From Swiss-Prot:
Residues 1-149 are annotated as: RNA-binding. It comes from Rotavirus A (strain RVA/Pig/United States/OSU/1977/G5P9[7]). Belongs to the rotavirus NSP3 family. Residues 150-206 are annotated as: Dimerization. This is Non-structural protein 3.
Length: 313
């Protein structure tokens, strides 16, 4: 007879599919939040946590055990099914279930889910109506049993009491956001005003520097104009000096060779560049002094040859 394990295979497939769904949900959430992630790292972390929860809670073994029992019943082995039925009705099993329920109650209490909330959740359920904002409140079998046992009372003072629920003070939140916006606006304005003030100071410094540069340029232009005037005056004086010396030279009783030599030196004077002209005049004066010195020495020698003595008074 062929052994059937289709139920166990289906349960294993559902568990594996649940794990894949958990990985897809985790990666999709990270993508929507704009968080970069490593797929292999997410896969490893989710698998480790998923395997731990499924094994530690006993859910995986419970599902596989029940699937194995169903497969055994399908294969004609009812012994395990009978044992499971007896186990479910055993007093120890009931005590264990009570213990688990009490443990779950304490866990819920530690999480902030008090007795009132647990009882209300057990007695009522809410059914949403598609296309409408209203809902239908349904009573559970526990609520029906409590009504039959007379455990439901009507509290008239409840109408005047305010339900203790968590509400959002939108006005306070709006005021808080408005304060934050005003603070941010003030900081932006301060930064903008500071930037404008610095820009004004830079512009003022630039304009002041431009004025100083303009004044200096005007002064330089004035000095250049004055220097040009001085240079023109010097050129005029030098030309006048050369002309005067030439005229004076022609009126003197000197030999033509001497006059020609002096005129050549006068014509060689640079009348355009005053600095060169001064150097030329210096050279001319030195030559004249040197010629005078030679002439005096010649005269002194001639006097001595005539048996005369030269004296200076």
């Amino acid at each position: 007879m062929l052994k059937m394990e289709s139920t166990q295979q289906m349960v294993s497939s559902i568990i594996n599919t649940s794990f894949e769904a958990a990985v897809v949900a985790a990666t999709s959430t990270l993508e929507l939040m704009g968080i970069q992630y490593d797929y292999n790292e997410i896969f490893t972390r989710v698998k480790s946590k998923f395997d731990y929860v499924m094994d530690d809670s006993g859910v995986k073994n419970n599902l596989l055990g029940k699937a194995a029992t169903i497969d055994q019943a399908l294969n004609g082995k009812f012994g395990s099914t009978i044992r499971n039925r007896n186990w479910m009705t055993d007093s120890k099993t009931v005590a264990k279930l009570d213990e688990d329920v009490n443990k779950l109650r304490m866990i819920l209490s530690s999480k902030g889910i008090d007795q009132k909330m647990r009882v209300l959740n057990a007695c009522f359920s809410v059914k949403r109506i598609p296309g409408k904002s209203s809902s239908v409140i349904k009573c559970t079998r526990l609520m029906k049993d409590k009504i039959e046992r007379g455990e439901v009372e009507v509290d008239d003072s409840f109408v005047d009491e305010k339900m203790e629920i968590d509400t959002i003070d939108w006005k306070a939140r709006y005021d808080q956001l408005e304060k934050r916006f005003e603070s941010l606006k003030q900081r932006v304005n301060e930064k903008y005003n500071s930037w404008v003030q610095k820009s004004k100071e830079r512009n003022e410094n630039m304009y002041s520097l431009q004025n100083v540069i303009s004044q200096q340029q005007n002064q330089i232009a004035d000095l250049q104009q004055y220097c040009n005037k001085l240079e023109a005056d010097l050129q005029s004086k030098i030309s006048s000096l050369v002309s005067s010396v030439e005229w004076y030279l022609r009126s003197m009783e000197l030999s033509d060779d001497v006059k020609t030599d002096i005129e050549q030196q006068l014509n060689s004077i640079d009348a355009i560049n005053p600095i060169n002209a001064i150097d030329d005049l210096e050279s001319l004066i030195r030559n004249l002094i040197q010629d005078y010195d030679r002439t005096f020495l010649m005269l002194k020698g001639l006097v001595r040859q005539c048996n005369y003595e030269c004296t200076y008074e």
